[in-house]
Amino acid sequence: MSIKYRLIIMNFLQFFVWGSWLISLGGYMGGVLHFEGGQIGAIFATMGIASLIMPGLTGIIADKWVNAERLYGILHLLGAACLFYASTATDYNHMYWAMLLNLLVYMPTLSLANTVSYNALEQYKCDIVKDFPPIRVWGTIGFICAMWAVD
């Protein structure tokens, strides 16, 4: 399988994960778990917290100690464990911490996916400016497919 197809699959799955819960989680927390609006908002605010803190820290880790591909895989496995735990949460505190931990490990994967893609394209002597946008658009398609599958 060519590098472009492998990167298409990676980008598709990267955003499929996010699309599988981002839009439907609020309705689930309000309708099924009966969380209040402020609680739902606080859980979604963890995305901003994680976005501010973690990409820089994981960038340092990826630059100094662990290569980006390995760190990317580790973070996704940790995120899967957090999402599995979140699926069992029935109260606000457990859901809040599960989603905070999930987003602390998921948000850095957005930039790591780009790093992995750029490095792979460069290694295979591809034109990043020309070849990456059609690959990245499959992330958006993955997000949309996940929303359709879940809702």
List PLM regions with ranges.
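Helix-loop boundary and gating motifs at the non-cytosolic
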Residues: 1-49
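Hydrophobic alpha-helix/TM-entry signal in multi-pass membrane transporters
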Residues: 3-11, 72, 95, 99, ...
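Hydrophobic core of transmembrane alpha-helices in multi-pass small-molecule transporters
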Residues: 12, 82, 92-111, 116
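Interfacial helix-cap and linker-helix signal at transmembrane-aqueous boundaries
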Residues: 29-30, 61-63, 137
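Helix-breaking motifs and short loop linkers at transmembrane-helix boundaries and internal kinks
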Residues: 34, 66, 88-93
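Residue-level signature of mid-helix packing/kink "hotspots" within the transmembrane helices
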Residues: 48-56, 144, 148
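Helix-to-loop junctions at the C-terminal end of transmembrane segments
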Residues: 53-67
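Structural signature of the two symmetry-related core transmembrane helices
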Residues: 70-84
